[in-house]
Amino acid sequence: MISNTNFLPDVQDVAHSFSQAAKNYDQVAGLQRLVADQLITKGAGLYQGRVLDIGSGTGYVSAKLANLEAVTKVTGLDIAQGMIDYAQSCHHNSKLNWQLGDAQQIPLALPGHASTYDLVTSSLAIQWCKNLDAVFSGVAHCLTEDGFFHCATLGPQTLHQLKWAWGQVDNYQHVNEFVPLEVLRKALKNHFVEVSVECRPIELKYKSVQQLTKDLKQLGASNHNAYAAQGLMGVGRLRKMVQAYESLRDEKGQLPVTYEVYYIKAKTKVVV
């Protein structure tokens, strides 16, 4: 079993965090929309028939896919009830339906859906899953023989500037950690063929560290790690972290924030 248990929290913590963020999520989800749009563009030709969107969130990707003529049905699966409720209230295309469930338990969340979907997609969601093997096993379970898995997730260089700044203060883990590429590839190859992973760093600019940390909190993406430093976010420590990050300002006076994005494409492994 390939898991991410050293990095990530209890699944209910993630569900609660994103439910709380649902109503304000789209207001600060610039990166999420950018990655989602790139994912859809890269998947041109794949999006057809019946589609499952894992970690559908506010429904941004699901709704876009439902507008494609070649797509006949889109199921949005999310672990956060708040996200499901918000998506249902915002999107009313008859091709859409929503399901509460855990990406690590797809057969349980979608009973009777074996070999049902022509495509499973996911944009910036599976990085929150402890057990990648369970995720990919579930994806393979519900794909048709000629089906594809197409998703975007985050790599370990994500927010490396923020990690560095905290590293100038102490040795505790203040920033989310994500699995390295070799672990991701190994998990994928257990269940799929023709696996390809494109790594594309995306750098955003912020005016202040405070705005960055506020956005992360509003997105429900502040530190979820099981080994996150508890009781170590005092004013003095925060001030030192901010001072360290300030040293990274560029010539235009902006602070760099990097996200390491992995774009994945894989095909169903046919068992003979």
Stretches found by the model and what they are:
Residues M1-A21:
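N-terminal, positively charged/glycine-rich alpha-helical extensions of SAM-dependent methyltransferases
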Residues G30-Q48:
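Conserved alpha-helix/loop element of class I SAM-dependent methyltransferases that forms part
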Residues L31, T58-Y60, S196-V272:
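Conserved Class I S-adenosyl-L-methionine
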Residues L119-N131:
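A short SAM/SAH-binding and catalytic strip from SAM-dependent methyltransferases
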Residues D133-E145:
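A short glycine-rich, Lys/Arg-flanked "PGG" loop and its adjoining helix->strand segment in the class I
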Residues F148-Q211, N223-Q230:
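Conserved catalytic/acceptor-binding region of the Class I
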